[in-house]
Amino acid sequence: VDPGESTFIDEGATGR
């Protein structure tokens, strides 16, 4: 899992 994916899972799209 790259940083964008983990933020997507955690915050709902913030890292995308």
From Swiss-Prot:
Q: Where does this protein reside within or beyond the cell?
A: Secreted
Q: Which cysteine pairs are covalently linked by disulfides here?
A: none
Q: How is it modified after translation?
A: Conversion of fibrinogen to fibrin is triggered by thrombin, which cleaves fibrinopeptides A and B from alpha and beta chains, and thus exposes the N-terminal polymerization sites responsible for the formation of the soft clot. The soft clot is converted into the hard clot by factor XIIIA which catalyzes the epsilon-(gamma-glutamyl)lysine cross-linking between gamma chains (stronger) and between alpha chains (weaker) of different monomers. Forms F13A-mediated cross-links between a glutamine and the epsilon-amino group of a lysine residue, forming fibronectin-fibrinogen heteropolymers.
- Transmembrane regions listed in the UniProt entry: none
Q: Which residues form the signal peptide?
A: none
Recorded GO CC terms: extracellular region
Relay the domain remarks: A long coiled coil structure formed by 3 polypeptide chains connects the central nodule to the C-terminal domains (distal nodules). The long C-terminal ends of the alpha chains fold back, contributing a fourth strand to the coiled coil structure.
Subunit description = Heterohexamer; disulfide linked. Contains 2 sets of 3 non-identical chains (alpha, beta and gamma). The 2 heterotrimers are in head to head conformation with the N-termini in a small central domain.
* Protein name listed in UniProt: Fibrinogen alpha chain
Give the organism the record lists.
Oryctolagus cuniculus (Rabbit)
